[in-house]
Amino acid sequence: KEEVPVFLAQKIMPGTCKAVLTQPDGLKVDISNTSYLDYITNKSLPVVSMEKEELDTLPLRYYTITIPRGGEYSLTLSDGSILTMNSESEIRIPENFDKRQRDVYMSGEIYFEIARDTAVPFIVHTDRGNIKVLGTSFSVRDYQDETFLETTLVSGKIAFNQSEKEVYLKPNEQLRLNKENGETTVEMVDVRLY
């Protein structure tokens, strides 16, 4: 008789609410038990009275939210957009959105429900391209150690920009970008899987 090794499957636990906020000054704060907006609006900062024109000339300050392995986190941005972040993901968000466009910078996997504002587009920046949104629901998966960037559109309309090329997606479509050769493909998918 030949002995066959038996491998026991490791139990994979569902993600738990874990998040670390890095403030513009570099201070790291565990925000696992609070919402991002509650933290930002309730933190004790001195109130400074300034004219709107003065505020527009201030440099943008960014907060970074990092989700460790095994974590997940949902947050609502100041514009009403809702983000659901998966394990090992990161997003950089300005303290206040610019009046011309709403820019965020991400890596990992995030599901976006963007508040509609046709005058101020929402731009998701990744290492390989940008996604321009007017008001929609979609996901982006862009882990550093994976060959493909994927963005899947649930509703609305998005445009993926890479260098000089722009690709528009319709609901139920997924764009896959091969990070090694730059090729993009678009196909219909079951969005419930994403």
Task: Name each model-derived stretch.
Residues 1-194:
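A residue-level detector for the "anchor" residue at the start of short, highly conserved motifs
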